[in-house]
């Protein structure tokens, strides 16, 4: 995959909605600007002098306060801010148009038509699954893809769109002033998933704690899948996910997920009666600790605020695992995935690196207290809220397809 900023999302309700569209649009834009700041060689045509204003525009769109130095908000500053807003709006319009090209190509191909017309309806009903579109949006420097993608639908139903300059398709390459040289690629494929209305917690998995954390945590960098491969190869056979840590105590996130822990704040005897969250809190790492801001992570944090659930935005500590009663990881595909056990190296490597795990042969184990009354009820409660959050804050695909501005 070419080096650049990317995000992945999917549809739900049989392709009628795109999951948390505004979140993913802002995240891939922010990732592009952060990568351009950290790795200017990837985007040589993005002027460094504009990156601060462009990032401020994204933070404002996400509802974050942007502070200016005293006396700085003068006419020049206001003009630069307006310019940055227009540039971000133009960039995001190009991303949106590229997504629509990919979705249209997907739904017009014969393979998708057969799915939609129900040729595999009986099989899907038996599996209680729906066919959805999985979208990957990639922003990279001009020519970074090296012609490695094609505009032709693949037999499996995958569609990859080329930039406009090479494929002649409008809306698939950035043409905004001062953002020239950034190309938009969208890959659309199909995924079978359980309908939201009948979604339940999947069987729990085991996760291994390894590390270190991401080098560019706030940006979704396309080189990460290659970097994480060393961890996936070296993890114990029973582990389905890897939880990242830099020091062997603070747990940051999974390699494709965010991590949550339900922990006791009072002795177990004091929490046996009363509301389900009495004497408990939810824990997840902060963005400042070096994690990628996930869409489901944010939905769960919002749920805690709306429902009065105690939450500590701080990396869960392995040394406090005696207080843990539930654990789960989240992402856009699995939504909420319970974790029943975690493995930790008995000795944390002194020279930590992504390729330093082959020699680890002894692991400590945390096992979830499955005999606790109502085990899993708090994770289920949060899953139900997230489903409602997804439905309320996601974009109707038809609205995007019919919007021309």
Please report, for each region that a protein language model flagged, where it lies by residue.
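Helix-start/capping segments and mature chain N-termini
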Residues: 1-82, 97-101, 117-123, 140-405
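Signature of the catalytic double-stranded beta-helix
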Residues: 85-119, 129-131
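Long, low-complexity Q/N-rich tracts
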Residues: 124-128
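Extended, Lys/Arg-enriched charged tracts that mediate electrostatic binding to polyanionic substrates
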Residues: 130-136, 146
